[in-house]
Curated annotation (Swiss-Prot):
Belongs to the class-II aminoacyl-tRNA synthetase family. This is Lysine--tRNA ligase. The gene is lysS. Its EC number is 6.1.1.6. It comes from the Bacteria. Binds 3 Mg(2+) ions per subunit. Keywords: Aminoacyl-tRNA synthetase, ATP-binding, Cytoplasm, Ligase, Magnesium, Metal-binding, Nucleotide-binding, Protein biosynthesis. PROSITE patterns: AA_TRNA_LIGASE_II. PANTHER family: LYSINE--TRNA LIGASE, CHLOROPLASTIC_MITOCHONDRIAL, LYSYL-TRNA SYNTHETASE. Mg(2+) 1 binds at residues 421, 428. Homodimer. The lineage of its organism: Bacteria, Pseudomonadati, Pseudomonadota, Betaproteobacteria, Burkholderiales. It catalyses: tRNA(Lys) + L-lysine + ATP = L-lysyl-tRNA(Lys) + AMP + diphosphate. NCBIfam families: lysS_bact, PRK00484.1. InterPro entries: Aa-tRNA-synt_II, aa-tRNA-synth_II, aa-tRNA-synth_II/BPL/LPL, Lys-tRNA-ligase_II, Lys-tRNA-ligase_II_N, Lys-tRNA-synth_II_C, NA-bd_OB-fold, NA-bd_OB_tRNA.
Length: 511
C-alpha cells in the first residue's frame, strides 16, 4: 500500500509560483469542462454540529441508524491510500480547529472512478462539497463516507504548511484571510469579540437604552482631546473631520428627550500607532439621564463583567500569564491616592507643589504645557508613576476641571470634577463622568480650551456653538461613559497587541 500526504508535501521548499501555475492550469481545464465555480451546492450540515451530536456514537449505532449528511468545507488535509481510497479533512466555519473539522472517506466503489481521479488532482485549500453517511473508523474518528464529491471553489494559492503557518506577524495582519484559515486562536479571538459586543448590546437593551447612529463626518472635531483626520466635502466646499468621539451628538439626543442612548461605532484619531493604539478604533458610548458618575461606575463594571462572561465563559481571566478577576468589585482611588499607593516616596507637600512636580516630570522626559495647573501636573505624574501598575480593575476618580472640559464640577471640592477613568492591566479602558449641563459654564470651558489651543495645545477642543445652543434648551442631569472595545477585547482574549483583535488593522502600504 502506498500513501501520499499532501500536507507533508506542502512543507517542502517548492517554488510558490510553480504551484500557482499548476493550479491555474487545473482551473483552465475545469473551465473547459463547463462551470468552473458552481453555485448550486447547498450544505445542510456543519462539522461542529455533527461532532457534537454524533461524536459519542459507537460504530454499531451509526451502522444501525445511518445518518445522511451534506456538507461543504475547505480541504485542509489529504491522505491517499493507493488508487482506490483516500481520506481528507474538511474545515468549515462552525467551530474552532477541532470541532470545525470532519474527516471524509472517498472510495472507488462508492463514488466512482471519475470522482476518485478528481480527488487526486484536488489541492489543499480547495473548497469541496460532499454528501454521504457517517461512520466511525477503526481509530474511532467520526467520518463521512462520501457518495458524492464536488469541487465548489478551486484554490489558486497554496496554504502555509500546518507546522509553520504564517510565521511573519505582519503577514498575519495583512493577510488576515489566510490567518483565519490556518489559525485556531485567531478564529477564537474574533468569535469572542463578536460575542462580547453582542453581550454589550443585549445588556444595554435590557436596561432600556436605545441604540443610535450619529455622524462620522463632523464640522467641528469635539467630544475628546485628540488630533483629528481632516477631509474636504466637495459638494459643500468645506473642511470636515472624521469624528474623534460621538459624545456631543449623543448628548444632543438627551436634550431632545431620549433619556438613555448608546452607540457602538468607530472613532478616528490622527495620532501614533502602538500595541495599544490604532488610528481607527471601536468605542461604545452611552448616556443616561438622571444618573451621575457613581451610578456610571457601577453600571460600567456590570457591563464589562457580563461581556467577559459571555465571551470567555467566566469573569476570571488570564492576561499575559497573570490572573485578572473581574468578578470582584473594582477598586476606586483618587489621582493623588494612586500616586501615594504606587509611588509612596512623594510627600503630601511635594504632591501639592506645582514647581516640584514639574521638576519630577522633567526627570521622566515630560514637558507639561506652560498653562498646566496643579491638577494637570498631578495627572501627568500619575501617568508616569502609577498608571502602568494598575493591574486590577481600578477607577481613578476626581479629575481636575482643567483636563475635563465636558465634566460636571464637584459640588463639594473646588477644582475637581465628577469624573473617572477605568484602568486594568496598566491601561485605560473607559472614561466617564457626570455631564456638565450648565450652558454658561460649558461655554466658559470651551473658551479656555480655545485659549489652550492658541497657546500650542493641538489636542485642546474647539468651541462648539451649536452644542452650547442645545444645552441652553436644557439637558437633564446626565451621566455618560465611553468604553474602548478594542482594548477590552485585548484583555478578554489575552491578546498582547491591539492588532490581534482588529480584523484588518492599519499597516504601511506594501511595496
Amino acid at each position: 500500500m502506498t500513501t501520499h500526504n499532501d500536507d507533508a508535501a506542502a512543507s517542502l521548499p517548492i517554488d510558490e509560483n510553480k504551484i500557482i501555475a499548476e493550479r491555474r492550469a487545473k482551473l483552465s481545464a475545469l473551465r473547459e469542462q463547463g462551470i468552473a465555480f458552481p453555485n448550486d451546492f447547498r450544505p445542510q450540515h456543519k462539522a461542529a454540529d455533527l461532532q457534537e451530536k454524533y461524536g459519542s456514537k459507537t460504530r454499531e449505532e451509526l451502522e444501525a441508524e445511518p445518518v445522511t449528511v451534506v456538507l461543504a468545507g475547505r480541504m485542509m488535509l489529504k491522505r491517499e491510500a493507493g488508487k482506490k481510497a483516500a481520506f481528507a479533512t474538511l474545515q468549515d466555519a462552525s467551530g474552532s480547529k477541532a470541532d470545525g473539522r470532519i474527516q471524509i472517506y472517498v472510495t472507488l466503489n462508492l463514488t466512482g472512478e471519475a470522482a476518485m481521479a478528481a480527488l487526486h488532482h484536488y489541492d489543499l485549500g480547495d473548497i469541496l462539497g460532499v454528501s454521504g453517511t457517517l461512520f466511525k473508523t477503526k481509530t474511532d474518528e467520526l467520518t463521512i463516507k462520501v457518495s458524492e464529491l464536488r469541487l465548489i471553489t478551486k484554490s489558486l494559492r497554496p496554504l502555509p504548511d500546518k507546522f509553520h503557518g504564517l510565521a511573519d506577524q505582519e503577514t498575519k495582519y495583512r493577510q488576515r484571510y489566510v490567518d483565519l484559515i490556518m489559525n485556531e486562536d485567531t478564529r477564537r479571538t474574533f468569535k469572542a469579540r463578536t460575542a462580547a459586543i453582542s453581550s454589550i448590546r443585549r445588556f444595554m437593551e435590557r436596561n432600556d437604552f436605545m441604540e443610535v447612529e450619529t455622524p462620522m463626518l463632523h464640522t467641528i472635531p469635539g467630544g475628546a482631546a485628540a488630533k483629528p483626520f481632516t477631509t474636504h466635502h466637495n459638494a459643500l466646499d468645506m473642511e470636515m473631520f472624521l469624528r474623534i468621539a460621538p459624545e456631543l451628538y449623543l448628548k444632543r439626543l438627551v436634550v431632545g428627550g431620549f433619556d438613555r442612548v448608546f452607540e457602538i461605532n468607530r472613532n478616528f484619531r490622527n495620532e501614533g500607532v502602538s500595541i495599544r493604539h490604532n488610528p481607527e478604533f471601536t468605542m461604545m458610548e452611552f448616556y443616561a439621564a438622571y444618573t451621575d458618575y457613581k451610578w456610571l461606575m457601577d453600571f460600567t463594571e456590570a457591563v464589562i463583567r457580563q461581556a467577559a462572561i459571555d465571551a470567555h465563559g467566566t469573569a476570571t481571566l488570564t492576561y499575559g500569564g497573570r490572573e485578572l478577576d473581574l468578578a470582584k468589585p473594582f477598586h476606586r482611588l483618587t489621582i493623588v491616592g494612586a500616586i501615594n499607593k504606587f509611588a509612596p516616596q512623594y510627600t503630601h507637600e511635594q504632591l501639592h507643589d506645582a514647581e516640584y512636580i514639574k521638576a519630577e516630570l522633567k526627570k521622566f522626559g515630560v514637558k507639561p504645557h506652560a498653562h498646566s495647573g496643579l491638577g494637570a501636573l498631578q495627572l501627568a505624574l500619575f501617568e508616569e508613576t502609577a498608571e502602568a501598575q494598575l493591574w486590577e480593575p481600578t477607577y481613578i476618580i476626581d479629575y481636575p476641571v482643567e483636563v475635563s472640559p465636558l465634566a460636571r464640577a464637584s459640588d463639594t471640592v473646588a477644582g475637581i470634577t465628577e469624573r473617572f477613568e477605568l484602568f486594568m492591566v496598566g491601561r485605560e479602558i473607559a472614561n466617564g463622568f457626570s455631564e456638565l449641563n450648565d450652558a454658561e459654564d460649558q461655554a466658559a470651558r470651551f473658551q479656555a480650551q480655545v485659549a489652550a489651543k492658541d497657546a500650542g495645545d493641538e489636542e485642546a477642543m474647539y468651541y462648539d456653538a451649536d452644542y452650547i445652543r442645545a444645552l441652553e434648551y436644557g439637558m437633564p442631569p446626565t451621566g455618560g461613559c465611553g468604553i474602548g472595545i478594542d482594548r477590552l477585547m485585548m484583555i478578554i482574549t489575552d491578546s498582547p497587541n491591539i492588532r490581534d483583535v482588529l480584523l484588518f488593522p492599519h499597516l504601511r502600504r506594501e511595496d
